[in-house]
Amino acid sequence: MVNLRCPVCAGALEKRAGAYLCPKNHSFDIAKSGYVNLLLNSSQGHHGDDKLMVRARRDFLDKGYYDRFIAAVADAAAEFTPPEATVLDAGCGEGIYSLAVLRAIEKAGKHGELLGVDISKTALQYASKRSPDFTLCVASCAHLPVEDGSVDEVLNIFSPFVPEEFARVLKRGGYLLR
């Protein structure tokens, strides 16, 4: 189970009727496209990749140039995943690696629950179309909205590397795939 935490007070977030709510009543609405914005930032505006960049990357990856690499990442993730796993894709973008990993986990006869985190709302809109089963959050890899020691595996492919945060969220014996 994905254990999200409030970016304001670090309390556990509970999903309720279109929003996430913590014990101190901080509330975060779930967007129509399925993601929740847990990025705390005083400046409004655009964060992460814009629509043009996301489309360009998606179009490039959809042509198959990285298929062998994506398959290798997915196979490695499935190999180290326990039978019931929570996988965090830190910097998930459009969810290409996330979806491949979940498929590989299922093919291996295991069950995985995936949390995708990215700073780009646009990227998460595309990720939600790839698979509505992902839990998706707008957040920074430097401040993951995840409870300590709650993740079996962290994927960090072509995204900011924040080892302290990854160590914080990984369960003892968990894996970082980078």
Name each model feature, range by range:
Residues 163-175:
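A short glycine-rich, Lys/Arg-flanked "PGG" loop and its adjoining helix->strand segment in the class I
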Residues 84-93:
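Conserved class I S-adenosyl-L-methionine
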Residues 1-47:
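N-terminal auxiliary segments of SAM/dcSAM-dependent transferases
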Residues 120:
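Conserved SAM/SAH-binding beta-strand->alpha-helix loop
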Residues 142-153:
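A short acidic, Gly/Pro-enriched loop at the edge of an enzyme's catalytic core
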Residues 94-109:
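Conserved SAM-binding loop of SAM-dependent methyltransferases across substrates and taxa
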Residues 132-143:
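Conserved SAM-binding strand-loop segment of SAM-dependent methyltransferases
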Residues 48-72, 76:
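Class I SAM-dependent methyltransferase Rossmann-like catalytic core
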